[in-house]
Amino acid sequence: MSFARFPFWRVAPSEREGEFILPVMPPATVGPEGAPHVMGGVALAAAVDALELASGQTLLWSNIQFLAPTTHAEELLVSCEQCGGGQSVGQWLAEIRSNGRVTHRVNAALGAREPSEQRLFSARPDVPAPDDCTPGDRGWGVPGTLGDQLDIRIAHEDEERGMQALWSRSQAGFKADSGWLAIVSDFFLGAHPATRGGSSLDDTFRFIQGCDDGWVLSVTEFAAFDRGVVHGSAKHFSQDGRLLAISSQSGVLPRIPRTP
């Protein structure tokens, strides 16, 4: 097992204003040997990083559409443009390309209306602590890819109700910031046996706050399987119970379900 010491979703500015480059490293990828591709959540995290750099503000929400594969991509080019907003909150667009082809489109809002008082209404469910849970399967690719970057523990599963509670953290000790939580938000299709091997269509990610301790509890609830597509949502909590983020997603179910 090998894991990245540097946040593998961080982008670097290009020579053009509002344009950023993500050098694709193995930890950013999933897939079988010989056919790695950038995990959708990593692409979202790269877009979030680029948008925060371009705007100088913190993400509020984003929605990404997964348009085309990124197999064997060596770098992703992220272009950011403000399209609206006021003095406190800006509305932005981002487009991600690989070898000139558009692979993702992102809508987002960034900023804050201050002063403001935080109130959290969603409460973390009572589940076993990470040390008391069964380790999860990280077999998402060959050694050195995204699966090696994660420590995963299954806190609760109910296939009949379409629910899962999953603890996860970075093996390298990365903070659960907006970028890392964007990656975590795309674990959606792994939360039910019938969805594994499917293809995400989108990911809507709402960022509340980050945390330093690393462990994140993702509580996923599937709403429906319909017309070959799954719909659902998730809430992401810190170990001390604070709400960190909210996400929702739709994905195409696999034609042939994977065997457990």
Annotate each PLM feature.
Residues 1-260:
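Terminal targeting signals and extreme-terminal segments of soluble enzymes
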